[in-house]
Design a protein with these regions (language model features):
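Mature extracytoplasmic or organellar-lumen-exposed domains after removal of signal/transit peptides
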Residues: 1-173
Length: 173
């Protein structure tokens, strides 16, 4: 019963706290009885997971936006900055995010479901397979990367003769 209390959930296994747990509770085995009066435990557990996800999102947002948060650190590199000692470090990190994100999408989202050597696919290895949200989630990952690419204006730091890369990258999205 302790997992139904949002205050206790952060002390539990990570496997019980996030989107995968919530998806299982809402779409996994036994979810067809979720709205029935006898399934208060599952409903309470799902509520606790959703509350925990909300709390984590709020904490991340606060860390990014507070006066001494990560956004401020990123835009104010210098000797006293724990993250970025100079502009080059900040720009290097900015530029590395898309390639690292593409690797994560490939390694953690796509490869688990790609057919093995025997030719058999592994659809139940896909994130959010129970809810049929695998592909919308992957699409959202790419949409977020496209937005990041556009908003960061990273192409503007390239020499003029290399800025054509921006159009090429936009086309790929």
């Amino acid at each position: 019963e302790s997992v139904t209390d949002p205050a206790n959930l952060p002390e539990k296994s990570v496997a019980l706290q996030g989107y995968n747990a919530l998806e299982y509770l809402l779409f996994g085995t036994g979810s067809d009885t979720l709205a029935e009066p006898g399934d208060a435990f599952r409903c309470g557990f799902a509520h606790a997971v959703a509350a925990n996800i909300h709390l984590i999102a709020a904490q991340l947002s606060e860390e990014w936006t507070q006066e001494d948060g990560f956004a401020a650190a990123w835009t104010s590199p210098g000797p006293e900055n724990d993250y970025f000692r100079n502009t080059e470090e900040a720009i290097s990190e900015l530029l590395s995010i898309p390639s690292e994100a593409f690797e994560i999408i490939r390694d953690q989202r796509l490869q688990p479901i790609v057919p093995e050597e025997d030719g058999k696919a592994n659809p139940k290895s896909a994130l959010f397979w129970r809810s049929d949200l695998t592909m919308p989630f992957i699409r959202a990952n790419f949409d977020a990367l496209r937005t990041y690419f556009e908003v960061s204006e990273m192409i503007s730091i390239l020499p003029e003769d290399q800025r054509w890369l921006g159009k090429s990258i936009e086309f790929e999205f």
